[in-house]
Amino acid sequence: MNFERLTTYLDELQERYGVPGSDLLVTKNQEEIYRHLTGYRDYEHKEATKEDQLYRLFSATKVITMIAVMQQIEAGKIGLYDELQKFLPEYGTLYVVDESKDYGWGNWPDASAPCHLSHKPIRIIDLMTMTAGLNYNTEPPTGMSLSEDKASAGKKEAQMKGAPGETLTQKVMRAAAQMPLLFEPGTHWAYSLAHDVLAAVVEVVTGQRFSDYLEEHIFLPSGASDLTFHPNAEQEKRMAALYVSKNGTKEMLPCTDLSVLGLRMLSQFESGGGGLIGGVEGYSKVIAALANGGVTGKGERLLTEKSIRLFMTPYTSGELQLDFMKMQKFGYSYGLGVRVLTEKGSSRSPLGEFGWDGAAGAYVLIDPIHHLTIFYAQHTLAYDAVFTEVHPRIRDLVYEALED
């Protein structure tokens, strides 16, 4: 193995792409085979990147949520083809917008949009494959009032009506049923709040708060620490400074407007789609189990090998694949909550490798064929080149290094 070219590339990220700091960890057969840190945790104060640094994982959270859902499918508490209303009755009556418009960030349909009754129910598999018709409106839903949460600086506290003992995660996702669907379930693909809804479903079937479930059934068995929705004061101090690209360029500015977090600003909301905060080492311990037959480095089983094979299976084709291609995951299709490599010519990694990424630049690759994982973290928002250029290049350089 020769990682020299990869190391050189990572060291050039600040100059070429404006990345203030980064951390990359590669494992094979549960063992770390490469790790390299670059730059600064806080660029303005020249505080160097450290191994115990924490990041907002954003949508890299989705991979963890899929493990939880698949565990409950294995336990027989959730069925792939169960209707969502079985767990959240609010989704029993659904409305679909009459016209397919260019809905998107900041322009989602609301309850006033012309709609008609849906002809199809939402099923669990529709949520897992992002074909449910939901949108990605992360603004607090109708009926929620916000106030400052004195116990968590910068976060908000929410008040909503709901059943006694019901978590805010469930309340928010039940309220989200008011939003009209973008299309009939199963007919198109759209990036959405599906994983957040699935987190609420896990809470319903287990009777546990989502964070408690993840800690007991995923993080502890993996030996993973510092993965949380609710960082304590000590963990907050280890958070990397968050930056945002200026107009899509490599010029990075400190991100002072945390309203970009949307629902994740709610102190008690546990977003299965993007709410986790964590470090590179802890996250890598979890995904290493997926690359090694579902068994953690501690010898505890998270998932069966059958479930791992399901993650390696693509589900988008035809119209659905055309929709997914707008995400610019070249060579990939979408599977059960993750991207799946389906075109060998576009990557040095093997067919069936899967994973996802996060808005601040996190990158997840799980390769069960070679028992390999890649987890890369940085902390910059709104810079597309990270996803279309940096992530694929890191992937290919890792595999080149393994071949040398």
Spans of features found by a protein language model:
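Short, well-ordered beta-strand elements
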Residues: 364-365, 371-380
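Short glycine-rich, acidic/polar surface loops and turns
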Residues: 337, 358-366
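Extracellular/periplasmic catalytic domains that process cell-envelope and extracellular macromolecules
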Residues: 18, 117-121, 366-368
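Active-site SXXK
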Residues: 7-10, 30, 56-84, 93, ...
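A generic structural motif
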Residues: 39-41, 257, 380
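Hydrophobic (often cysteine-bearing) scaffold residues that line and stabilize catalytic clefts
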Residues: 2, 6, 57, 61, ...
